Amino acid sequence: MSRIGKKPVVIPSGVTINVAAGNKVEVKGAKATLSKTFSTDVTFSVADNVATITPNNNSKNAVAQSGTARAILSNMVEGVSKGFERKLKIIGVGYRAKAQGNELNLTLGFSHPVVYKLPQGITAETPAPTEIILKGADKELLGKVASEVREYRKPEPYKGKGVRYEDEYVAKKEAKKK
């Protein structure tokens, strides 16, 4: 059986979990409200500030789904209580970013500025023109947004120019010699 799925999710104070019909789970907290529909192979039970996920049968798929559901529920609880953030760095001459409301204006060496509309629930800050901080309660959506912003200009392997995650290491290639 999955060891992750066996672990209960501790619910901090100020966070409530409601399980509706069809395995639709809603997590409410100080920062946001998140809801997700999970597989019918698992059953949720909430008691005494602890949520447990149990597989409906011992099939390989049900056990795998219990571990996945537990990890997602844990991320939802952490997201509505503390929130998540992802930092991006921009490296390159003239490469800049500026957050304006729910838009992110990127100057990445194209003939035109790139305007990225942030989805609801995600906020962006630019403490420096070469630094982007994305914040949100939904870890999955935050990762998707960070990936889409990075996709506009991935770090190239010769000089390392482009948009990268703060903790990302870019392996550099040696230039061709005559």
Curated annotation (Swiss-Prot):
Molecular-function GO terms, alphabetical: rRNA binding; structural constituent of ribosome
Keywords: Ribonucleoprotein, Ribosomal protein, RNA-binding, rRNA-binding
UniProt superkingdom: Bacteria
One of the record's GO cellular component terms: cytosolic large ribosomal subunit
Transmembrane annotation, as ranges: none
GO biological process, one term: cytoplasmic translation
Subunit and partners: Part of the 50S ribosomal subunit.
PANTHER family (UniProt xref): 60S/50S RIBOSOMAL PROTEIN L6/L9, LARGE RIBOSOMAL SUBUNIT PROTEIN UL6M
Stored NCBIfam families: L6_bact
Similarity comment: Belongs to the universal ribosomal protein uL6 family.
HAMAP family per record: Ribosomal_uL6_B
Chain's role: This protein binds to the 23S rRNA, and is important in its secondary structure. It is located near the subunit interface in the base of the L7/L12 stalk, and near the tRNA binding site of the peptidyltransferase center.
This protein's name: Large ribosomal subunit protein uL6
Organism of this sequence: Francisella tularensis subsp. holarctica (strain LVS)
Gene transcribed to yield this protein: rplF
